[in-house]
Each structure stands twice: as structure tokens, then as C-alpha cells.
Amino acid sequence: MKQQRVLIWSKSVSDFFDGNVCGIGVQLYFWAQTFTQNRWEVSTLTSHKSFIHENIHFIHYRNWGKLEFFFFFLAILWNIVQLHPQIVIHRGAGRITLPLAIISKCSGVKFVLFSASDTDFETGRELIAGGSHNRRMWHKAIKWLQYIIVQNQYQHDMLKSKYGKESLILNNVWGHVNITRKNNQATDVVWVANFRRLKRAEWFINAAKVMPEYDFTMIGGASKQDHGYYEEIKQQATSIPNLHFLGKKDFNETNSIVANSRLLCCTSTFEGFPNTFLQAWANNIPVISTVNPSSIISKNHLGIVVETEESFKLQIRKLLQDDRLYSSISQCVNHYFSINYEMTVNYNKLVNFVNEKQDS
């Protein structure tokens, strides 16, 4: 039987191995793992020379600078012709989606788009760099799409309402991760995110100030769009004795720190589905969060959902002090995670969705 091929159109997996961790990179890496385990040949992009690592083929893709968009079409066409993939995958909103969708369709290749944020289908709120013309290209791209994977019910409903498009709600996948447990890494409360103002890191800082009896840890790198915010938060954090500002850490280091914590906090104004939740739940750790995708936290007792900064502080203290409540939530996390984030189950859902849509 001829080996099936998938092309992941992103440099995020390569960035992941370089230690530049972001949610898109983590998820695309685990999807690459999933496809290789199911005997697909997996290719993706890199700024480095072409190489193979963990059975993933990394293809050199140069940066064309200001001329890059004009070479998108040629580069996409060239790689599709050379690799003959059955599936092309891309994640997140952006102008590149349009040439990917057009060339894939014209080449008879199934193009699968994974959403990355709740704003992906909110007209005018998409997190797309550049001018309004980039948003218009994204809007046109959606009309070309046949296979769309969303992270939660809100994204599903927005896509249906705004564009009349159906989609599959699919859990993020989570592969095997080696965890190092060290007593000197132990912390009570951890916050993990790239520093952007929409993440509201100041909530976490203010919580640490009023709870000096607990250890707080912040992990994350600066955002290209908001580097000043990183420096602002770092300066505030250094003046708080019980708050450890670690800055950027690689994926394995972050996992070990989360695994040695008691609570994970999310203070974002909006998200798609934070991978940090999975880092916590894989270790039976509850979350306290301002986002609740598809009501997953409240429905399954996986943590506590808050709306205000005052409630955020109160619930941190409550969960750290109430051993019975903590144990109850931790048990629910263990049960829910073990049956909902298995890689093979989600792989089969994806493949069945693509095949059924093709046949319909």
C-alpha cells in the first residue's frame, strides 16, 4: 500500500524544537507525532537546512522578506508537486490561507484548517498582522475551505453564523511527555503564556502580592507585537519576594515546572483552547481560568472559572486551602483527561471527518 503523506504548512514545529514555544507549535508537533505513529510521511517547514528529526521531514523554506507573499503561490505549488501529499494542514488565521486553499483545491489535495483562537471567525477582531487587505484575504480564504477544525462550540457557532460553514469540534491532542519531578522546582501557583496585554499578567502579579504565604511562578517570552509589556511585567515581578519570574523556558522545562505545581492560572481575555490546560491536566492539576471553552471546565469539574480579578484571588486561596475540594477536582481531571485526549481517538475523528466530507 502506498504511504500516505501530510504536509504541515508552518515553521512552528521547527521553532518548537528550537525552544521557541507557542500554542500552535505545540499542537502541530503533537499532530505530526500522531500522523507518524499512524505511518504517514510527515513534512513541514523550517528556516534551517532540510533535515529529518523524529521521522518528521523538515523542508527548508527561505524568508523572502517584503517579496514573500509573491513567492507563496510558487512555494506552495512546488512543494505540493514534489511531495504529492494527500492532506495539507495549516493552523490559525492569516493571508497565507488563501493561496494554500486555492492551490490545494486545484491540485486535488485536501486542505485542513485548524482554528487557533476564538477571534478567528469574528469579523474585524482576527489576530492578523498587516493591513486590512490581509483580513480580506482571510475572509475570502474561508469561502474556499471544506475541512475546518475548531477548538470549541463558540468557534463552531461563529463560523456557522458568519460564513455558513460547518466544522468539526476536535480536542487538542497530547502526546507522551517526559516529566522531571524535582523538589526544588515546586511552586504553588504557575502562570504560563507569551506576554501580550490580552493575557492580563497583572492579575497574577496582584494575586502574588496579597498571598505572600504561597509561591507564584511566571513563565513566558516576550511577544514581537508587545515587547514593552514583557519588560513592564518583569520589572513589577522582581519586586515581589514570593513571585519567580522565569521568562522564556522550553517545552520540557515548562512541563516539569507545571508538573511540580499545585495550580495553573489563565487570565486571558480570550483564547481558543490553551495548551497550558493540557500541561496541567496531564498531571492532575486543576486550573483557575477566565476562559472556559465550550464550558469544559465547569461541566467537567476541572477547575474554577472566574470573571473578575477579585474572584480570581479568592478562588486561588480557596483551592489551595481546601484539601477536600482540591482532591475532588484533581480526581475529575484525571478521569476526564484520560478518556478525551488520547491521540489515536482524535486522529481517527479527523481522518473520518475528512473522508466523510469528501464522500458527501
Please give the residue ranges for each predicted region.
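Nucleotide-sugar donor phosphate/pyrophosphate-binding loop at the beta->alpha transition
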Residues: 71, 110, 120-140, 144, ...
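An aromatic- and histidine-rich active-site surface loop
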Residues: 88-109, 113-115, 119-120
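Short hydrophobic beta-strand element within catalytic cores of glycosyltransferases
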Residues: 282-290
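Membrane-proximal helix-turn-helix segments that form the acceptor-binding/catalytic region
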Residues: 30, 77-78, 102, 106, ...
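Conserved donor-binding/catalytic core segment of Leloir-type glycosyltransferases
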Residues: 7-9, 181-199, 205-211, 216-219
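Short, structured helix-loop element that forms part of the nucleotide-activated donor/catalytic region
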Residues: 215-242, 253
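Aromatic "clamp/platform" in nucleotide-sugar-dependent glycosyltransferases that forms part
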Residues: 269
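N-terminal subdomain of nucleotide-sugar transferases
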Residues: 1-50, 209
